[in-house]
């Protein structure tokens, strides 16, 4: 009977394919991909919804977007009278169409919607929510995912992504909508009056905040190459740099045009060195010093440096975090009660740097919304000077409550320009940080373990560390095991336990005098990540051996 219902359901979807907006994507998919759309459901989680285009409740299409919008409309109307919302969207396939669908549904429920007439960055959305004092915000993006993906992120009135509790409540409203094919969305001219143009003054205010944060960029002969990887950071980043009287940059022209197919890159991800290939070519031709790339929605960025011999140094997220923290410490020396926030899987290097400079630090779960929650809870006397995640997400000043590559681009250029005046580079500065606080190094291993056996192995690895924690790993003596699922720390050296004041998450962190390793399974994919952050000789060899020991 269940198979018959699934077949009927599939037939109903195919009958509506012409109205779905995604017929072309569906027809390009394999039989397995098509079937997955009918055998699964999109779920609204803590980061919203992200998925492939296609037919069925497990795919993004006109009908599943209408379901999401209707659930959010009911959620917002249950939270407050006369709710307001701002919607932004990136350059991906169907981002504009999804934005209009959501705006129409929300307007149909007397929710005032601010909708721009062009694509915007994710940090601009966070800022706009705060600037316009709206009840919520929606960002339509799938970050650096492949071209056949899109997603919806929902933000609260503070400009941060919804908290875990708010996400769960919104998810219930969405699920209560039921079958997306049965939704009837009447559009009336009276209701479309709730859709308002997005005020240009908001963008101007955002730019002013960054200009005030930067002040000026000192004159040097620093040359920069910038690429948006076909995303949203052009034109806003070039306009911002020019407003700061910095014109010594070249754009990778082929990659600075919006392109939902990301035609010129294998991966539109600044973590991936291949994303810099065209930037490196241009840097070699123009003898540039600094290379910067942002991901498609401009919340994350990567940097590389070219020396006089044409050698390229790529910086990982933890190294960029250390450089930016170091610079912010220099910039804020007059402030008292300074605070840095980072995720629990980010480097020991930044914590050591904070301690050395008498800067308080706090660690939170992975996900920038947890950083935003920490910012919201700051005392009046505390000064947050920097926040970051090792996955290339950074925030210098909290007028935005999400990762913000747009404000970081001129900051890193200013830093590099100052160093250039003294004949130094970012690589030199990183080496100085190592000499000051020790050579803490970091790496990440990501394992995909498919199917039932893969899931079983992931569970077995996590269970082993919970029930039978090792006394030492590769000659490193284990001090403590932090289990964020049980909210407990087991101190092996004292044979005692203590509590972790944090939301629950399936993460285990093993602490040594030399640093830590962390294990973090994905909640949505058959993946598990191993983070290694240590100060020890032969780091690469030790990290490889730890990885082999755990996953052999």
Swiss-Prot record:
Pathway: Glycolipid metabolism; diglucosyl-diacylglycerol biosynthesis. InterPro entries: A-D-PHexomutase_a/b/a-I, A-D-PHexomutase_a/b/a-I/II/III, A-D-PHexomutase_a/b/a-II, A-D-PHexomutase_a/b/a-III, A-D-PHexomutase_C, A-D-PHexomutase_C_sf, A-D-PHexomutase_CS, Alpha-D-phosphohexomutase_SF. It catalyses: alpha-D-glucose 1-phosphate = alpha-D-glucose 6-phosphate. Binds 1 Mg(2+) ion per subunit. One of its GO terms (molecular function) is magnesium ion binding. It holds the Pfam family PGM_PMM_II. SUPFAM superfamilies: Phosphoglucomutase, C-terminal domain, Phosphoglucomutase, first 3 domains. Signal peptide: none annotated. The keyword Magnesium applies. GO terms for biological process: enterobacterial common antigen biosynthetic process; glucose metabolic process; purine ribonucleoside salvage. Keywords: Carbohydrate metabolism, Glucose metabolism, Isomerase, Magnesium, Metal-binding, Phosphoprotein. It is an enzyme of class 5 (isomerase). Its cofactor is Mg(2+). Belongs to the phosphohexose mutase family. This is Phosphoglucomutase. It comes from Staphylococcus aureus (strain NCTC 8325 / PS 47). The lineage of its organism: Bacteria, Bacillati, Bacillota, Bacilli, Bacillales.
């Amino acid at each position: 009977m269940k198979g018959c219902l699934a077949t009927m359901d599939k037939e109903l979807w195919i009958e509506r394919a012409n109205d779905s907006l995604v017929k072309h994507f569906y027809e390009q998919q394999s039989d397995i991909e098509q079937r997955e759309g009918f055998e699964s459901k999109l779920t609204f989680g803590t980061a919203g919804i992200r998925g492939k285009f296609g037919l069925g409740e497990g795919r993004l299409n006109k009908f599943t977007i209408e379901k999401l919008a209707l659930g959010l409309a009911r959620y917002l109307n249950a939270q407050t009278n006369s709710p307001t919302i701002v919607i932004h969207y990136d350059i991906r396939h169907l981002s504009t169409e999804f934005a209009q669908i959501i705006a129409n549904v929300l307007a149909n429920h007397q929710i005032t919607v601010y909708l721009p007439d062009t694509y915007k960055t994710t940090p601009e959305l966070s800022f706009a929510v705060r600037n316009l004092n709206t009840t919520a915000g929606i960002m339509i993006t799938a970050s650096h995912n492949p071209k056949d993906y899109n997603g919806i992120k929902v933000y609260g009135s503070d400009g941060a992504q919804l908290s875990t509790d708010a996400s769960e409540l919104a998810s219930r409203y969405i699920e209560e909508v039921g079958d997306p094919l049965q939704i009837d969305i009447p559009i009336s001219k009276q209701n479309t009056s709730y859709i308002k143009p997005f005020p240009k003054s908001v963008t101007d205010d955002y730019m002013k905040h960054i200009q005030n944060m930067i002040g000026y960029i000192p004159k040097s002969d620093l040359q920069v190459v910038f690429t948006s990887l076909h995303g949203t950071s052009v034109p806003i980043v070039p306009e911002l740099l020019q407003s700061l009287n910095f014109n010594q940059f070249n754009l990778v022209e082929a990659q600075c045009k919006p392109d939902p197919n990301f035609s010129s890159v294998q991966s539109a991800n600044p973590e991936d060195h291949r994303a810099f290939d065209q930037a490196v070519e241009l840097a070699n031709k123009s003898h540039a010093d600094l290379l910067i790339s942002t991901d498609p929605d401009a919340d994350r960025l990567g940097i590389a440096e070219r020396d006089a011999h044409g050698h390229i140094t790529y910086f990982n997220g933890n190294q960029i975090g250390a450089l930016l923290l170091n610079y912010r410490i220099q910039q804020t020396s007059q402030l008292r009660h300074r605070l840095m926030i980072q995720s629990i899987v980010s480097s020991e290097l930044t914590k050591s740097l904070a301690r050395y400079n008498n800067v308080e630090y706090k660690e939170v779960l992975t996900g920038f919304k947890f950083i935003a929650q920490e910012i919201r809870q700051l005392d009046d006397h505390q000064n947050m000077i920097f926040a970051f995640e090792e996955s290339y997400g950074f925030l210098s000043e909290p007028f935005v409550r999400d990762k913000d590559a747009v404000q970081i681009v001129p900051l890193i250029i200013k830093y590099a320009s100052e160093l250039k005046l003294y004949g130094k580079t970012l690589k030199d500065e990183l080496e100085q940080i190592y000499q000051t606080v020790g050579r803490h190094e970091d790496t990440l291993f990501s394992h995909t373990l498919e199917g039932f056996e893969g899931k079983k192995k992931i569970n077995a690895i996590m269970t082993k560390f919970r029930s039978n924690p090792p006394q030492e790993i590769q000659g490193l003596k284990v001090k403590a095991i932090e289990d964020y699922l049980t909210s407990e720390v087991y101190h092996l050296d004292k044979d005692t336990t203590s509590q972790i004041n944090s939301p629950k998450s399936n993460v285990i962190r093993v602490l040594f005098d030399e640093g830590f390793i962390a294990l973090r399974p994905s909640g949505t994919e058959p993946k598990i990540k191993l983070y290694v952050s240590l100060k020890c000789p032969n780091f690469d060899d030790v990290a490889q051996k730890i990885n082999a020991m755990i996953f052999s």
